[in-house]
């Protein structure tokens, strides 16, 4: 049998309102249906990319309360952030995987 990993990206680049609990619920539904990894970007409440990890950490905490999906944080996306700001999600212990676009 071929092994596969299903990764979900529950927040679109066009999403303008970020709700950590709603994202976690969506991730949980995906997990129940076979997803094993979630791809998240670090965004503020208005959907803009940000180096502030507080909402992302809150979102991951809610996800962890519901399921044991692998959390992969992206440093990518088109933004005005510096490379130093973009790599901030690589450091927290609650992040299991990263994608890094340089």
Task: Label every model-predicted segment.
Residues 80-102:
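Extended substrate/RNA-proximal surfaces in nucleic-acid metabolism proteins
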Residues 61-71:
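Active-site neighborhood of glycoside hydrolase catalytic domains
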Residues 25, 29, 54-62, 85-89:
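Alpha-helical scaffolding segments of alpha/beta enzyme cores, especially the outer helices
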Residues 34-59:
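Glycine-rich, proline-tolerant flexible connector loops at the mouths of alpha/beta enzymes
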Residues 4-10, 38-40, 69-75, 96-100:
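Hydrophobic faces of well-ordered beta-strands that scaffold small-molecule active sites
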Residues 23, 30, 41, 98:
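Conserved, mostly hydrophobic/aromatic
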Residues 7-25, 74-83:
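Active-site mouth loops of central-metabolism enzymes
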């Amino acid at each position: 049998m071929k092994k596969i990993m299903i990764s979900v990206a529950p927040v679109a680049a066009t999403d303008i309102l970020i709700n950590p609990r709603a994202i976690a619920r969506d991730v949980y539904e995906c997990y129940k249906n076979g997803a094993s990894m979630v791809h998240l970007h670090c965004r503020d409440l208005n959907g803009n990319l940000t180096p502030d990890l507080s909402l992302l950490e809150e979102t991951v905490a809610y996800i962890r309360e519901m399921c044991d999906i692998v959390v992969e944080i992206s440093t990518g996306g088109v933004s005005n952030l510096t490379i130093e700001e973009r790599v901030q999600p690589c450091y927290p212990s609650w992040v299991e995987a990263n994608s890094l676009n340089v």
